[in-house]
From Swiss-Prot:
Lineage of producing organism: Bacteria, Pseudomonadati, Pseudomonadota, Gammaproteobacteria, Lysobacterales
Pfam families, per database record: IF-2B
Binding-site positions, substrate: 58-60, 101, 204, 255-256
This protein's name: Methylthioribose-1-phosphate isomerase
Species of provenance: Stenotrophomonas maltophilia (strain R551-3)
UniProt keyword annotation of Isomerase present: yes
Function: Catalyzes the interconversion of methylthioribose-1-phosphate (MTR-1-P) into methylthioribulose-1-phosphate (MTRu-1-P).
BP term (GO), one: L-methionine salvage from methylthioadenosine
Amino acid sequence: MNTASDIDYARYDHIRPILWTGEALQLLDQRKLPFVVEHVVCHDSDEVAASIHALTVRGAPAIGIAAAWGVVLAARDVQAADGAHALQQLEPALQRLNASRPTAVNLAWALARMRRCLSAAGADWKALLEAEAQAIAEEDLAANRHMGALGAGLIEAGSGVLTHCNTGSLATAGFGTALGVIRAGMAQHRIARVFAGETRPWLQGARLTVWELQQDGIDATLIADSAASHLMKTGAVQWVIVGADRICANGDTANKIGTYQLAIAARHHGVKFMVVAPSSTVDMETVDGSQIEIEQRDPGELYGVGGTRTVAEGIAAWNPVFDVTPGELIDAIVTERGVILNPTAGNMRAAFGG
């Protein structure tokens, strides 16, 4: 069995996008990377919600962690005898946090966990709430490291991999999901080539993923999103490895826009397709991808690059930021609970219940 014991975490796991100071939440501003490394300081839950919506912090696990700390900040001004009474006062703040990004299930999952913590808490509810947020972050980091080893174990030595969007330390508590598998695969000398799609329109691949890999000393080749099929045709890629914002009960997976077309191209070219996400991303109450709300962002995001407009005035734009990849196009879903090969409703139910 592949293990994480031979991974140098001092080298491969040092970026942290979320920092709790005890008084405020510091978020690495991912809109300004890679050329400006700057933190946004949030002093209340509404500032956290605004930062999530504005993509200051992004990536499904990181969004959930930030929201949990947002609840802790909201609790600062609440006076209540126990957690149940505090929850009544905190509910509006929780609703605003929940509305900040609708597609990522980790956000609702983290808030539900904070609600459960409050419901059972006594007079020490504030301390328990802070401990719960810290536990969510620590558990995510441990899960990522375990998933990295599990996913890397599927990859044959000498393989090339292609990833999409950013699924690394910047999107999680640390190490990453899909990028964690790539880090583990590089550390174990299984991966010989890494390619990253630019990921329009926010360019998470170009701005964030290749920057993260550079920090680790991992050589990565950036490609235009539209070059992916041609790259697969050359035989340079054996695995496409992506993260997820929501995984349905039948294995259908919502992820960054462009993931679905990668899965189609991968199947056509005989390239394996891996989804890597913590079990908190699995939503067994959502039967299939048709039930997922797909976030639509400002069409203006498509009108230019880096603040410079490149599109004529009066042009309409359609800007969904997620799509759904059918489970039948996925070869493996990797969570900290294990690997689900060729996901179906049956083997998803066997792994996660429901």
